[in-house]
Amino acid sequence: MSEMTPREIVSELDSYIIGQHKAKRAVSIALRNRWRRMQLDEALRHEVTPKNILMIGPTGVGKTEIARRLAKLANAPFIKVEATKFTEVGYVGKEVDSIIRDLTDSAIKMVRLQSIEKNRFRAEEMAEDRILDVLIPPAKNNWGQAESTPEPSAARQAFRKKLREGQLDDKEIEIDLAAAPVGVEIMAPPGMEEMTNQLQSMFQNLAGQKQKARKIKIKDAFKLLIEEEAAKLVNPEELKQQAIEAVEQHGIVFIDEIDKICKRGESSGPDVSREGVQRDLLPLVEGCTVSTKHGMVKTDHILFIASGAFQVASPSDLIPELQGRLPIRVELQALTTEDFERILTEPSASLTEQYKALMATEGVDISFTADGIRRIAEAAWQVNESTENIGARRLHTVMERLIEDVSYDASEMNGQSVTIDADYVRNHLDELVADEDLSRFIL
């Protein structure tokens, strides 16, 4: 798991997300507390439960982006789910338990990759030996078995040197490689994905691991053999134990659009996709044991981060028990013109950088002036105010409209330069921004 300090986490998030300092501080402290908890003795560690977070803010201000970037920083099992995809147990739709199953699957994949990376050096040596066995077959005894020689021959060493230097990369060899598993597609009704996965695993295990002779270039064979040999060095049972422990101790679940499962108004009858989902989420958030195909997983110490716009509903519309399980509330602010300006220029791979790079592939040099960027930001803010406020996503719409002519003619403009200043922006956008009906449908 990540050992970054809260200040380092916030600094890293600042490279991609503008503003929202309170939300960044909250998630950075929560992430650091995961590390702090692991430094405690076992008896006390078991008593320290994570403080789950509820992020509240309008659409397009960075809630989901914080989750995406946090997933990369966490170096821990992480899953992002949409609350609207789930229904109450017993009804058609995904059950909330599938969140933990998916989290465990992602942990298995993460631990397997780490284990393969750890054994890469040995796997490379074993892959080299298999290729050399094809290039220089070992001597055989009277029973047709390969003789084990105490010292490798000079010819074998010479070929190993050539192989490492890449001199044999384009040479084709015929070698036995693991055959691709037969894909078994099983159609199952919604909510029965777990049964489908188990049936697919069963059919693949019945087929067994077969070898198939393939004619392939050495450089391609080397990559496949490394994966094959590294997989042999991984202990499946140990892998499952490590993955389950990683989920239980370091797992993070991000639940987006939680405001969409709030109960609205007085209604009779079962509300299976709203209040029913909240009731099913409760045991997960407060701690229970979920059965997965890899084993039983306890959710007591999994960190849950929920987010929602809460434009129609409010956090108080969540059932009281779930409100109590999300003790840390963070409100994200709506974006201003100044925020839009910074979003266009400051983050890594900002929108302006992306468009410059895209047009450079056609030999067109695009440059943005400070007053041009200011005018783009003002146009985006103005449209958000007069129509629906969709936050920073409005910049994508405005930029596409602005660059449309250049994008269309770029293939015929090789070697030309285009400067996007305030006048250019006014000529291309002002008419649309001023006409509310046009901006509603086009921007």
From Swiss-Prot:
Entry-linked Gene3D superfamilies: 1.10.8.60, DNA helicase RuvA subunit, C-terminal domain, P-loop containing nucleotide triphosphate hydrolases
Keywords annotated in UniProt: ATP-binding, Chaperone, Cytoplasm, Nucleotide-binding, Stress response
Superkingdom: Bacteria
Keyword check for Disulfide bond: no
GO molecular function terms listed in the Swiss-Prot or TrEMBL record: ATP binding; ATP hydrolysis activity; peptidase activity; proteasome-activating activity
Known function: ATPase subunit of a proteasome-like degradation complex; this subunit has chaperone activity. The binding of ATP and its subsequent hydrolysis by HslU are essential for unfolding of protein substrates subsequently hydrolyzed by HslV. HslU recognizes the N-terminal part of its protein substrates and unfolds these before they are guided to HslV for hydrolysis.
Name listed for the protein in its UniProt record: ATP-dependent protease ATPase subunit HslU
Organism encoding this protein: Pectobacterium carotovorum subsp. carotovorum (strain PC1)
